[in-house]
Each structure stands twice: as C-alpha cells, then as structure tokens.
Amino acid sequence: MYEDVATSKGPRTRAVLSRSSFGHRTCLAPGVGSPPLRQDAKSGYALTFTYLGKQGYSLTLWASTLASRDKWIEHIELRQHRLRQQSCVFDLLPVAPRGTPVVVTCAVPFDGGRQVFLGFPDGVYLQDLRDRSRSPTLVLPLRHVLQMDVLEEFQILLVLAEHVVYTFTFDALDPSDPVASMRHGRRIASHTSFFRAGMCLGRTLVCVVKSGAASSTIKTLEPIDVHARAKKHPTFGKMLPSGQDTLRVFKEFYIPTESSSIHFLKSKLCIGTIKGFEIVDLETLDTQGLLDPADASLEFVRRQENLQPIAIFRIDGEFLLCYNEFAFYVNKNGWRARASWLLRWEGTPTAFALHYPY
C-alpha cells in the first residue's frame, strides 16, 4: 500500500486499493501507519509504502519531479492490476445501486444465488441480484440484525436481532407490508450469543448458543417439515399459522466454558471454546478435546497465549484448524498432519471461509 504526501512543492493526494492472494488488504487512508512528515523535511515528491500486518511499517521514497513520481505510481498500479488478475477466483458484484447508503451487518444468499437477504441496523432487506438497479426492499423491520441463515429446503429464514432468534417462513414475508410479516414470525430463543445451522447425523440442525464467561448452553433444534405433515394430516396445515412452530428441540446440553463458534461434522459437533476445539457426540453428549494431548508436536498450540479457535474445515480426510494466530492440519485422531505445513497470519483474522480447492 502506498500514499502520496504533501511536500513543499504542493499537495497531491493519491490512493491505491489492492488485495493479495492471501487476502490482506493494501488500502490507503492518509497518514495511516506512519508519523507525519514535515513539509520541509526533504525536497521532492514523497511516495509512502505502508505494510499492513502485525509487524507493519512504512517506507517513504522521494522522487525528484512530479512526473517521475507519477510514473512510479503508474507502474505500481499496473503491477497490482496484473497480480489481482492472476489470483482472481471470485467476481465481485454490487448488491445495491451506487450511492445507496448501506451498512450491511450480514448477508445470506438463496435461490441459487439469485436473491440475497441483507441484514441492516434497521431490519432485513431483500435484494434480487438479477435486477441490481433496484435498491434492497425492507421485509422485516427488526433492530440491530446481527446474523441470518436460510434453511432453503424448509423455506425458513432465521434471524438473530438484539440477542433474540426468530424464524420466518418465506411465504410469510410480504415486502409490501413488512409490519404484517413480523406478526408471522416465531421467537425461538432469547439471550442468544450466536447460532449456526448445518447437517449432522443426517439431520438439518440449528444450534442456538447462550455463552457466558464460565459456561455455555447449547440448544439444538431441527425443522418441522410443515408441508409434508400437512399432506398427511390436512387439518394440521389449517391449525398451524404461517411461521409458527417451525423448529423443535432435538438436544440441549451444557459445557463448562465460554464458546465462540460451532462447526458441524458428520456425526458430531465441534465447538470453539477458550480451551480450544471441543468435540461433542450428539448421541451421548460426551465431550472431549479435538487435539490429542499425547502428540508432542502440538506443544506450540498449548504454549500460545490468547489463542482463539475460529474455524475448522474437512479437506481430503484431514481437518484444517484455523485459529486467530495460525492454521494447521490434524487427522481424525487429533494428531498433527502435514508436519511441515503451518500458516501464520500477518493480520488478525476474525472469520474464515473455504471454497475448495481454491
């Protein structure tokens, strides 16, 4: 990342935005990462490079003329463009017209990626990506929307707002009358820290987590297939108002530690806690640490202070464990795999996503 600095020969502001293949951002704001320079510190035109990372630093070069500095900037921008093209995996598409004042807190696509629910501080909005010239439409006037997910097979939208989890069936959402849509919602949990939906034991499950400093209560729920039950019992559909009783409790359990994430394995849950990744057997509710304490090669994990487990991904029979400091592989027995492979982050990650094999 680089920035232009005003000098005695006059101010000139330039900024460049790029993204490396490792995801760290090289975007500029004036004066970031470097002390202010006096205008008479040197003669010439300054060009400041700032490295964004835990060990970040700034380096300022001086060009004798404005033309030579612009030439440097031109070549840097060209090189950045080529690097972005080489590492490009996804195409970025705007979800709202340019100039729309949006502060999106969360988003979840559905309908094969053709539509997306957007979480805003003032509610849930719906955007049709096939017509991005139109602004998002308010469908649920909920305050402080923090998290959303979609159970598309069951046509259910889950929303976490102000620490309360709600469910809404798709057919209850009416963009022409958002207030009426709210009346069809179902409040399924309060005092919620976060929730997660996924597949485990061949079931679609929703885990709702109430996490405290010393313990966590985790309630797992599964969807009620309203349409299937209505076909078998015609009166059931008439008795069940739209959006009501969409989930039922499957299991509920307690762990004596603070939790920050949940991940679904084939037959077990993996929970990220301040102690590390914990495995919970949903059939017996037995809990054990994911990492085997007998593996001496994992001592570097146990020695690391303030380590936070964030995500786990299954790749070719192994598990990629992502923490806030580093990532590494383990096998199904919790022993280190690919012993020479360790990825340390330059920045401070708060979330991960994997699109295998990219």
Role assignments for model-derived ranges:
Residues 1-53, 130-154, 173-196, 296, ...:
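Pleckstrin homology
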Residues 4-87, 155-156, 160-164, 171-173, ...:
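Canonical pleckstrin homology
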Residues 7-30, 82-102, 129-137, 241-254, ...:
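A short helix->beta-strand "capping" segment at the edge of beta-propeller domains
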Residues 16, 48-50, 60-62, 106-108, ...:
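Beta-strand cores of modular interaction/reader domains in eukaryotic scaffold and signaling proteins
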Residues 26-41, 96-113, 141-158, 186-213, ...:
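Structural signature of eukaryotic scaffold interfaces centered on beta-propeller domains
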Residues 44, 48-50, 57, 68-71, ...:
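Intrinsically disordered, low-complexity regions in large eukaryotic scaffold subunits
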Residues 63-131, 141, 147-150, 155-167:
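Alpha-solenoid helical-repeat scaffolds
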Residues 80-84, 121-138, 165-187, 214-253, ...:
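Surface-exposed loop/turn elements that mediate protein-protein interactions on large endomembrane-trafficking
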